[in-house]
Regions:
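Hydrophobic core of transmembrane alpha-helices in multi-pass small-molecule transporters
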Residues: 17, 99-121, 445-476
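Hydrophobic alpha-helical transmembrane and interfacial-helix anchor sites in secondary transporters
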Residues: 66, 126, 164, 405, ...
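Loop-to-transmembrane helix entry/capping segments in MFS-fold secondary transporters
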Residues: 42-43, 133-146, 230, 381-382, ...
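Intracellular loop-helix junctions on the cytosolic face of multi-pass helical membrane proteins
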Residues: 1-7, 132-140, 162-379, 402, ...
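A gly/Pro-rich, aromatic-decorated transmembrane alpha-helix motif that marks the paired
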Residues: 28, 62, 85, 152-168, ...
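Helix-loop boundary and gating motifs at the non-cytosolic
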Residues: 3-53, 301-311, 369-380
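Central cavity-lining transmembrane alpha-helices of secondary-active solute carriers
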Residues: 47-68, 155-157, 389-406
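C-terminal ends and interior cores of transmembrane alpha-helices
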Residues: 79-99, 366-377, 424-455
Length: 555
């Protein structure tokens, strides 16, 4: 798995881990932040969220074009600096007035621009490492490992966001309750119903920070303190970027030969031989067809920060008991994820000593995870953002499983091509949303709840199961798609084509808002049903053009 990979892969992967940790910490609380601070509706919040995600993934198109001319490393460094300023602006506490909104949108613009310069170009540099014939056969597994490293950062992000939010909110004598922000805004806006006012009063009575406050004062104070706690959560991203820069520059000698522009790559024999116009056209056409398909995958997948977060808040139990508790402790998840790698090491090691050491480590990690679980309270309170740690956990834990399966198939000459894996990923994604559809059948519509939490709450295991299946889909589609772009893109347009991959992701992220717009208008199962249909139609399309896509890698 890690054997015979160039050192540059690990340096670039770790640098990306730090940046992604900050990004996903911010993303875990962003939707909740704008609803709590500004009182935005679900439709407006998901629209802002989707536009931001679209910008984050669209800007790499321009970043890639620029990097093809001036070099990938220069763009990566500039991107980190711009992102840092953006996160710093987002971390500054402001009021919910116009100036606060302007600063927030300016911060989002800076983060999107910085990400555009950083994200795609770092991955092009990873791909450049594998233009060396010595490492060419390792390209697909390298991008799976790189993708796994991204998700290590993402796995810890929701827990960090939760810890920071709870710490600063707790210092003011408050605790997080999902009902309060919406009820507080209704109270301040004069639209609260009598029964909801009674509910808000009951919640306020249970908090020491509300002592001596009338309901209006409590509402404003709670919103202010919660918003400020979120601001501090955004500040974590600044720290993670500093770590990312330190890794990038301290290990730069490991990948310096991959830091070139398009002309330098050709001059140094870094890229493959010049393609004919017909070959170039064939490859670009194949890539554009793949880009068209992945739009709908990302539209569905990135509901994790939009409608799936709303579903976690309004329809899912806020406490867990029994064995499910282990999934809501980041340390136990980390130990379990690491144990997967040591277990594989025990089977794959070529020496008896290596097998023994890996076996002992696996047992120790399992005992550690059980010790963490045994020390947890009988009932654990959870936040909506906690669910976002499951997807990266599953990515980290399942990556070696995925590599082992496809490695075994490759030895038999039966490994599916990258385009075929993408098509299978779309089908698996449809299965994931089918689980959520079934769970939603007997639940009240969001419109009927009027901004409150449903009286009928489902087990968190429904959402966890959905995240598990969607992760299988993601592992089939995302790292394989990036590897496909890296392999098929004409040498002159590597940065631009990687940027187009992210531009397709951007369009999918913009379309994330469509289910959000439907959220308060249709039944829950209709929201998930739309995503199922889109995933299945996309799978049908990609399988219908499979021969064209597979032939592009041969020309």
């Amino acid at each position: 798995m890690f054997k015979d990979q160039p050192k540059g892969l690990f340096a670039l992967a770790l640098a990306n881990t730090g940046e992604r940790f900050g990004y996903y910490t911010m993303l875990a609380i962003f939707l909740l932040f704008i609803q709590a601070k500004f009182g935005f509706s679900a439709a407006v919040s998901t629209q802002i969220y989707s536009i931001f995600l679209a910008a984050v993934y669209f800007m790499p198109l321009f970043g890639g074009m620029l990097a093809d001319k001036i070099g990938y490393g220069k763009c990566v460094t500039t991107g980190i600096a711009v992102m840092f300023i953006g996160y710093l602006c987002l971390a500054i506490p402001t009021g919910p007035d116009l100036s606060g909104k302007i600063l927030m949108f300016a911060a989002l613009a800076l983060i999107a621009t910085g990400t555009g310069l950083f994200k795609g170009n770092l991955q092009v540099m990873v791909g450049n490492l594998y233009d060396d014939p010595k490492y060419a056969s390792k390209r697909d597994s390298a991008f799976s490992l790189f993708y796994m490293a991204i998700n290590i950062g993402a796995m810890f992000a929701p827990s960090m966001a939760k810890a920071v939010t709870n710490f600063f909110l707790g210092k003011s004598g408050f605790t997080y309750v999902a009902d309060i922000p919406a009820l507080a805004h209704q109270m301040l806006g004069g639209t609260i119903l009598p029964e909801n006012a009674d509910k808000l009063q009951t919640l306020a009575n249970g908090m020491s920070g509300a002592a001596g406050m009338d309901l209006a004062t409590f509402s404003q104070t709670y919103i202010d303190k919660l918003s400020t706690a979120y601001n501090y959560g955004f500040g974590v991203a600044c720290i993670s970027l500093i770590i990312s820069v330190a890794i990038y520059y301290s290990c730069r000698s490991w990948f310096k030969h991959a830091d070139v522009n398009a002309k330098q790559a050709q001059a140094a024999n870094h890229a493959e031989a010049e393609l004919t116009p017909a070959q170039t056209k064939s490859r670009i056409t194949a890539l554009m067809l793949v880009f068209a398909v992945v739009i709908f995958f990302w539209m569905a997948f990135h509901q994790n920060g939009a409608t799936m977060t709303l579903f976690a808040r309004d329809y899912t139990a806020s406490t867990v008991e029994g064995a499910t508790r282990i999934g809501f402790n980041i340390f136990s998840l980390f130990l379990i994820a690491v144990s997967v790698y040591t277990l594989f090491g025990a089977f794959q090691s070529e020496t008896k000593k290596g097998k023994t050491i890996c076996g002992i480590c696996t047992a120790a990690l399992w005992l550690g995870a059980y010790a963490v679980y045994a020390g947890m309270p009988a009932k654990v309170n959870i936040l909506p953002s906690d669910f976002q740690q499951f997807n990266p956990f599953f990515v980290v834990a399942l990556t070696p499983v995925s590599l082992a399966i496809f490695g075994a198939l490759a030895k038999k000459g039966k490994e599916p091509s990258a385009p075929r894996k993408i098509g299978l990923g779309m089908i698996v994604a449809a299965v994931g949303f089918s689980i959520l559809t079934f769970a939603s059948l007997n639940l009240a519509s969001p419109k009927s709840l009027n901004g409150t939490v449903s009286p009928d709450l489902i087990s968190p295991e429904w959402l966890i199961s959905t995240y598990l299946v969607l992760t299988f889909a993601e592992l089939l589609l995302s790292p394989m798609g990036i590897s496909f772009v890296s392999k098929v893109a004409p040498p002159k347009y590597k940065g631009a084509m990687m940027g187009c991959w992210f531009a397709a992701t951007a369009l999918g992220n913009y379309l994330v808002s469509i289910p959000g717009l439907l959220w308060n208008k249709v039944e829950l199962w209709c929201v998930w049903g739309l995503l199922i249909v889109l995933c299945l139609l996309s799978a049908l399309f990609i399988f219908s053009i499979m021969k064209k896509l597979e032939s592009a890698t041969e020309c």
